[in-house]
């Protein structure tokens, strides 16, 4: 039996690994730059998950966890109105760790939605309905906040897009993030 529950700070290392998988390693390496490794980026992400004031904070994360306490999935979400405030920790961390300034990064969300930043299920636990469970728990979180739930999906990931539509997300418009064409989808209240 797998449960969906609020993340804990002590789970930061695993949560960071799954966030990086959701971002994809090519994107993570781009953020780290040519003089740093994916392990360097993982260290930064782990610190950001441990922070309470980061978009990747454990406080913004739901985990799918097995009976043996293995984390097999994550969903990171936050109020879109808080993106710029929450992103400051990433901008500061990347500048300190990699000497790279991302303060001019485009916003991927705005006020008026609970934004799903990262969703990932461990490869060995896929095709069991865990992503759907994580999505449904996050949508419920949005309902409690009186916000629709939004996300960006890469146009090159039709399988994920099918899942989102199946759960009730609707197309809101085109977007771009990290050099990729994306679709903005939203699950109405």
What do the predicted segments below correspond to?
Residues 26-49, 60, 95:
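Conserved GNAT-fold acetyl-CoA-binding loop/helix
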């Amino acid at each position: 039996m797998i449960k969906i529950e609020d993340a804990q700070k002590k789970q930061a290392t695993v949560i960071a690994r799954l966030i990086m998988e959701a971002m994809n390693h090519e994107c993570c390496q781009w953020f780290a730059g040519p003089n740093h490794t994916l392990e360097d980026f993982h260290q930064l992400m782990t610190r950001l998950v441990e922070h309470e004031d980061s978009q990747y904070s454990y406080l913004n994360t739901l985990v799918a966890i097995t009976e043996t306490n293995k984390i097999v999935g994550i969903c990171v979400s936050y109020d879109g109105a808080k993106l710029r405030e929450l992103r400051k920790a990433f901008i500061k961390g990347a500048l300190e760790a990699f000497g790279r300034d991302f303060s001019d990064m485009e916003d991927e969300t705005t006020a008026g939605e609970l934004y799903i930043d990262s969703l990932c299920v461990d490869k060995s636990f896929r095709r069991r309905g865990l992503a759907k469970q994580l999505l449904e728990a996050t949508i419920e979180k949005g309902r409690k906040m009186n916000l629709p739930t939004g996300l960006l999906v890469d146009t090159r990931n039709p399988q994920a897009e099918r899942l989102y539509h199946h759960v009730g997300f609707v197309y809101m418009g085109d977007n771009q993030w990290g050099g990729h064409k994306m679709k903005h989808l939203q699950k109405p209240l």
